[in-house]
Amino acid sequence: MRKSMISFLEKKAKNEKITMVSAYDYHSAKILDNCDIDIILVGDSLAMTVLGMQDTLSVTMDEMLIFTKAVSRGAKKSFVLADMPFMSYQSSDRDAILNASRFIKESHANGVKVEGGIEIASKIKLISQSGIPVVAHLGLTPQAVNMLGGYRVQGKDLQSAQKIIDDAKAVQDAGACMLVVECVPVKLAQKISSILEIPTIGIGSGKYCDGQVLVYHDLLGLNKDFKAKFVKHFDKIDPQVGVEKYRDEVKSGIFPSQEHSFDYLDDELLDKLY
């Protein structure tokens, strides 16, 4: 039976961790599905990981659709989540709905992910009202890398931390059913997770999120040119074993540890957030 957003809300209520992995092809999707990974994200990170691009900004809708089709064929139980690429939803309401629907109709995804907060809340509302589950993404948002000045931890001061909290509330109110929180201080992610009713999925944001996500290639140590602080290599000899280790460590709370997280907020500053 296919996993659903309802089941992930139930996991949050029961304090059971949600597992997510970014993957881009049929065979890796089969492995993740067999390992009972909850969500397979067909991330626009494939631009760099698979296609050798410098960032995620150049990958197209057609390219994302092809890879999402492959993952959907391999995943029978896992929820397949498709990343909407840069400028596929920001430009107009019409583009947002039409492109989101293409992932469902053509690539058989189960939901879509978008980056941004208050500024795209109206797009989230339109897509979700059309019956498509929407996952939001805050903190370090790679599609806004030129605005952020690079790949840096976000929410390190009172103003930026409060902005992320306000954005999180806005996307939930707009109809987002899950939130990815990338590269924010541990205590900020914990605060967001406690405020929201929807599940949070962390990457570089500490152990208090309702789940975790890593890229398939990264957790297996397949990319020797990339090793971010928040990445842990589990097993590159046997992918199935590596994924199972990742799954078990997320569910038990072993991963992520402090060494895979960022902490810039003191308790005095945290108390000022609302």
Swiss-Prot record:
Known cofactor(s): Mg(2+)
Binding site for Mg(2+): D44, D83, E115
Active-site residues, record numbering mapped to chain: E182 (proton acceptor)
Keyword check for Nucleus: no
Cofactor, free-text remark: Binds 1 Mg(2+) ion per subunit.
Record's subunit section: Homodecamer; pentamer of dimers.
Full protein name: 3-methyl-2-oxobutanoate hydroxymethyltransferase
Protein species of origin: Campylobacter jejuni subsp. jejuni serotype O:23/36 (strain 81-176)
